[in-house]
């Protein structure tokens, strides 16, 4: 069973760009990895520019082949639908005219993640921050959920997340 989520970024013009993420959308998984590895506006924009996501963090590709080991660590990457490939029209990022419209997007998601970039030079937040909302019960307002600092899904001694910006953004891979 998948825990579906929607990942968005608040743009300068107060619109929101978002993508659907099919697997592991819980705060302990997607929330943790978004907060830890997608911590700047540029990284979030690159993530979203590739369209909908099967798994934000996966140890294998679409052929179910494990990613290689680097320095005795298992490589983890984002598994985008564009790499399968899927028709771009079906998986491209969604644009919402405001935050309310972002929350009204119904993907049967259980969590929504919104990245709030820093505003102007006066902002003490260098990189911006993530907010997580529980959208599993449509009869309730979406309460904010704390994103944990650690995750049972990640072992820093045995795993390494690698930014693979895929075919769409064509940005070279960066390791952190």
Per-range role (PLM):
Residues 1-30:
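Short, extreme N-terminal segment that most often corresponds to the first beta-strand
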Residues 30-37:
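An exposed acidic His-Trp-rich patch
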Residues 39-176:
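Low-complexity intrinsically disordered segments
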């Amino acid at each position: 069973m998948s825990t579906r989520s929607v990942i968005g970024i608040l743009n300068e013009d107060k619109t929101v760009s978002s993508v659907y993420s099919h697997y592991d959308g819980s705060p302990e998984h997607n929330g943790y990895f978004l907060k830890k590895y997608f911590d700047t506006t540029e990284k979030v924009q690159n993530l979203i520019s590739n369209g909908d996501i099967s798994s934000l963090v996966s140890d294998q590709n679409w052929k179910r082949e494990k990613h290689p080991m680097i320095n005795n660590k298992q490589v983890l990457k984002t598994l985008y639908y564009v790499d399968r490939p899927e028709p771009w029209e079906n998986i491209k990022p969604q644009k919402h005219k405001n935050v309310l419209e972002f929350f009204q997007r119904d993907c049967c998601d259980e969590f929504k993640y919104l990245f709030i970039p820093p505003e102007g030079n006066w902002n003490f937040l260098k990189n911006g921050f993530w907010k997580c909302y529980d959208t599993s019960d449509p009869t309730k307002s979406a309460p904010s959920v704390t994103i944990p600092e650690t995750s049972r899904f990640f072992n820093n001694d045995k795993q390494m997340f690698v930014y693979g910006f895929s075919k769409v953004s064509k940005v070279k891979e960066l390791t952190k």
